[in-house]
Amino acid sequence: MKLKTGAGAAFIGVMASATLAAADEEPKYGGTLTYMIPADAPPSFDGHREATYATVHSAAPYYSVLIRVNPDNPGSASDFVCDLCTAMPQPTDDGKTYTFKIRDGVKFHDGSLLTAYDVAASWNKIINPPEGVTSARQSFYIMVDKIETPDPLTVVFRLKFPTSAFLPALADPFTWIYKKETLDKDPHWYEKNILGSGPFKFVEYQAGHSIKGERNKDYHHKGLPYLDAITGIYADKQAVRVEAIRSDRAAIEFRSLPPSAVDELVGALGDKVTVQTSDWNCALIVTPNHKRKPFNDARVRRALTLAMDRWHGAPALSKIAIVHTVGGIVFPGSPLAATKEELEQIAGYWPDAEKSRVEARRLLKEAGADGLSFELLNRSVDQPFKYLGIWLVDEWSKIGVKVTQRVLPTGPWFEGLRNGSFDVAIEGNCQSVINPVLDVSKYQPHSVFTEQYGNFDDPHDIDLYQSMLNETDPAKQRALMRQFEKYVLEEQTHEIMTLWWYRIVPHRSYVKGWKIGPSHFLNQDLATVWLDK
């Protein structure tokens, strides 16, 4: 049953019917959900530090957040609900003050009470991390002036300027609430340990194998969770994960599988498997290390993007990998995204691939980089890292560039990115809630965005971004986004976009209560999941 054919269209109709039927069913309590995590291990357990699904899928069920996207409507960019707060507040002070009341009686898993002081301490670690502590999304919150706690059950966020980007940023799923007492003693403690107030209590972690949790009987959302226990199994090989679902040793992988693997499962299991699909706020990018020659030369960086024929590559790759759409730096189809006509004006997106490659060869010669060879740092994850890596090596060979790959497990790969030990790297810009202005903040220098690995300084880049962030007129903001996009992708080629992803999640049909969203980071606390068996 092919997802791209008429049969696939019928298949999607079946999926919709199944979802509607599930909504009318009474949830059942009990059972253990076993799910696959497509990684060898998370780089750490600290959600504030990390930017990978390996951390979220491992530890999100053990934590609470202040607010979140509605788990019944995870595709929304504006439907936010309280987790630890009692009600979504209306902003005051001309949109610059948000006051949250915190639920009374919430407990951490060690039995201690969670208060506004814990919420404020966690958010201060995210927004203003102490020296030596990494905060992956610190730049998302540059609009925040200060956080106040007038009493144990009240948290007040005061902004420097009003912006519609604030609430979506506050709903980021990595913003777990930690215990203030623990953070005061050691802000690095949560990198290797788990202690939260989420729907499940942490039980056991076996490095490279599994992570287990049990139902939190004191969970602050009455009646949840439904499951008795959860077990996440680590496996970086796709074949292992597919076979686990086929043989019912696992029920689901929350990230995504490619069409070929989904077809295999549907063919083998029929109505015993259900498939959910969604556009995906995620794309792999190619990051040149500006501190290594010749990648300090914009002409060389531009040659690499000109070599890539995205328009013909996307249809072919979408048959075997979880990629789908040609796009710029903004989530395709969203109001601030470039149209196809606008994209075609940017180097690397020209309709004529041969014209692009002629220009690429000219630039390499002009820069004295004829016969260029380099090493590409890649991640040891099949989808879509390895597939994109093979494609990139082939594309670059068409302009006479020779590339070898250094493929590393998730932890060492992240370490290589962070310490700059690479020529060029494949990495990702994968966000959660669709929030275009903040989603593109990654394309600023490391001094502003800590998870920027290109090692460049560029005040003009920062100025362009700040102008866009502070602009409240939608049309003017869109025009500024086009300027920023062309500057990042062509004029300086600080980053090189590959393709945007498409999320396809097959799961055992007895798994109910989970809905797919535009990000593999969303809806992962598993509180509403139940098993119909």
What is each stretch, according to the model?
Residues 87-132, 156, 241-244, 294-297, ...:
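Aromatic- and charge-enriched surface segment that lines or borders ligand/interaction sites
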Residues 67-75, 171-225, 229, 358, ...:
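Gly/Pro-rich hinge or "lid" segments in bacterial periplasmic/extracellular proteins
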Residues 142, 195, 231-243, 256-260, ...:
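Short helix-initiation/N-cap motifs at beta->coil->alpha
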Residues 34, 115-122, 152-158, 198-199, ...:
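Alpha-helical secondary-structure segments
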